[in-house]
Amino acid sequence: MENSYEETIDKRRVHLRPDTLRDPAPASLHLLPCEVPVNRPTPVGRFFTPAIRMGRDGLEASFRGRSLRGEEVVVPPGFVGYVVTEEKAEVLMGKQDDHERQEQELLEPPEALERDCDRFMGATASFSSFTVWGLESIPGPDAKLRGALSWPSLAAAIHAQVPED
């Protein structure tokens, strides 16, 4: 390595396992207008099991006594959404010690893409739509989410072949 910046980049290589993208189970997703200051598995279903009603202006539900208004958002055509989680090293390596792992790599060398990665991700579910919720009102067209979902069609338009006259 030439400098510490390159060392930092080297330690952030992530590999998304392609075999997990083949047939992940479909999921029902809800984007809630709140922040949870914890980054670990939690029994969300215990706290949010939506009784969704169709109101005059769209979907309605409540969360801990607060009124939520929402709408279904469809993933752009030609794309699929995935729920991705980090796979633990013990699961990947079968809790082998270094000597056993080195012997295993001699018999079955890791794929070139996996060799230099220190984090591995896998898809646990897929989705083609999700429900986005707002407090008291439906998130408007200016929401950051709408901007992010408009990029695929914008990129396709920019990179499309221009017909000759």
Swiss-Prot record:
<comment type="similarity">
    <text>Belongs to the RNase H2 subunit C family.</text>
</comment>
<comment type="function">
    <text>Non catalytic subunit of RNase H2, an endonuclease that specifically degrades the RNA of RNA:DNA hybrids. Participates in DNA replication, possibly by mediating the removal of lagging-strand Okazaki fragment RNA primers during DNA replication. Mediates the excision of single ribonucleotides from DNA:RNA duplexes.</text>
</comment>
<dbReference type="InterPro" id="IPR052863">
    <property type="entry name" value="RNase_H2_subunit_C"/>
</dbReference>
<comment type="subunit">
    <text>The RNase H2 complex is a heterotrimer composed of the catalytic subunit RNASEH2A and the non-catalytic subunits RNASEH2B and RNASEH2C.</text>
</comment>
<feature type="modified residue" description="N-acetylmethionine">
    <location>
        <position position="1"/>
    </location>
</feature>
<dbReference type="GO" id="GO:0005634">
    <property type="term" value="C:nucleus"/>
</dbReference>
<keyword id="KW-0007">Acetylation</keyword>
<dbReference type="InterPro" id="IPR013924">
    <property type="entry name" value="RNase_H2_suC"/>
</dbReference>
<dbReference type="Pfam" id="PF08615">
    <property type="entry name" value="RNase_H2_suC"/>
</dbReference>
<keyword id="KW-0539">Nucleus</keyword>
<protein>
    <recommendedName>
        <fullName>Ribonuclease H2 subunit C</fullName>
    </recommendedName>
</protein>
<dbReference type="GO" id="GO:0006401">
    <property type="term" value="P:RNA catabolic process"/>
</dbReference>
<dbReference type="GO" id="GO:0032299">
    <property type="term" value="C:ribonuclease H2 complex"/>
</dbReference>
